[in-house]
Amino acid sequence: MAGREKRRRVAALDGEERRRRQEEAATLLHRIRGLVRWVVAEVAAGRSPTVALHRYQNYCSSASAAAASPCACSYDVPVGTDVLSLLHRGSHASRLNVLLRVLLVVQQLLQQNKHCSKRDIYYMYPSIFQEQAVVDRAINDICVLFKCSRHNLNVVPVAKGLVMGWIRFLEGEKEVYCVTNVNAAFSIPVSIEAIKDVVSVADYILIVEKETVFQRLANDKFCERNRCIVITGRGYPDIPTRRFLRYLVEQLHLPVYCLVDADPYGFDILATYKFGSLQLAYDANFLRVPDIRWLGVFTSDFEDYRLPDCCLLHLSSEDRRKAEGILSRCYLHREAPQWRLELEAMLQKGVKFEIEALSACSISFLSEEYIPKKIKQGRHI
């Protein structure tokens, strides 16, 4: 009886959530139609319609940031405004023209309750858009203009992330039961809105930078011996991976650890999870995981675990430029001074190495020694 009552409550909540999303979609569609009608009326009257777009910036790389002085960067407050005019010549007119064309596609998607990818939109007007980045910017502009996220526009990416471990959930009507084989990889859902009934007995979430490391842990049956959820974004994480991680953190309230290569690009991937990306600054506060813990690998691990010299690689000039650029970001001075010190040590020593270098100790050293002991002993920053 209690079980049936619980299922009824869950069904009622799912129904309420469905209605809320339908109302949000209807409201957004109404606002889009209103803007399009206004633009058409302005042009018909011989006037130049203008659209004001807030400009967001979640971090900067200025000299003042390096001096640890205050800057205007914020996760939820705009730092400026761009005014786009359709009839003026120049880049702003082109930008507004592209925005309106993409907006018409979005309007059609919402009216017909259909979805498409950014690439689909590009191929609708390739001679006008010229390159994919133009469409990407227009989608970001629309999100800023209507204060919504990309998924609200029915523009969906192709998810590349993977998950395994002690978790099960429903994705629409599909059951995703990772717990039946905790070492098997499952694709991360494209739409977080389709997820419901999440259940987990995990103690923590582990993010690994690369699929090769993810597969190493799967082969070593890491999740059988450690009650956890393992996720990889397979390099720089896409939006579905970041949204999925943020969703799990909010639902399960578990600590999150991140394992990346000891190089500037690994550090940048780690920073993307914690602080968000500059391209999606307007949405960073809803995608980032501010309490993520850096588990490794650290430059100091090379000496601590007595790895052979052949595992070390010298930082290239490109690596150095990347590291110096990251070091100037204001959030490292403001929110993660220990992370900054670790990156400075890497730059000072001029070396880097990959997670897989730990296999020099033994093939399963990463899964049997490095990760479990570091988490148990609290050796993370």
Swiss-Prot record:
One of its GO terms (cellular component) is nuclear chromosome. This is Meiotic recombination protein SPO11-1. Mg(2+) binds at residues 209, 261. Required for meiotic recombination. Mediates DNA cleavage that forms the double-strand breaks (DSB) that initiate meiotic recombination. Is essential for both homologous chromosomes pairing and crossover formation during meiosis. Residues 23-162 form the Topo IIA-type catalytic domain. Plants silencing TPO6A1 have no apparent growth defects during vegetative development, but most of the plant are completely sterile due to empty and shrunken mature pollen grains, and defect in the macrospores. InterPro entries: Meiotic_Spo11, Spo11/TopoVI_A, Spo11/TopoVI_A_N, Spo11/TopoVI_A_sf, TOPRIM_Topo6A/Spo11, WH-like_DNA-bd_sf. PANTHER family: MEIOTIC RECOMBINATION PROTEIN SPO11 (PTHR10848), MEIOTIC RECOMBINATION PROTEIN SPO11-1 (PTHR10848:SF3). Its cofactor is Mg(2+). Its EC number is 5.6.2.2.
